[in-house]
C-alpha cells in the first residue's frame, strides 16, 4: 500500500522507520529494508548531493533491490513489491508531474 509504506528512510535523523506491520520474515519486507538501507548509504556517502533529483536515488535503490532479490531469491522487484514499470518511471523521473 503506497499510502501506508512498510518502511521509510529519514535522512535528517539517519533512521529507517518501519511500520507496525513490518515482518522481517517475508521476502517483501526484507527487500524493502534493503531498499531503505541503500538510501542510508546514499546519504552517508553524499550521493544525494550529486544527483539531478530524488528520482535518481530511487532508481539506484530499486535497481540494487532488484539485483539483491534476483541473487538471493530468484525473484524480481516488480513481482515482489507489485510495482509496475509505469509507476517506476514516474517515481524515478526528474520531471515534475
Show the residue positions of the predicted features.
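Active-site scaffold of zinc-dependent metalloenzymes
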Residues: 1-27, 40
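Conserved aromatic-histidine-acidic binding/catalytic patches
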Residues: 21-25, 29, 49-53, 57
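Short alpha-helical catalytic segment bearing the HExxH-like zincin motif
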Residues: 28-37
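Catalytic Zn2+-binding segment of zinc metalloproteases
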Residues: 37-54
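Post-HExxH zinc-binding segment in Zn-dependent metallohydrolases
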Residues: 52-86
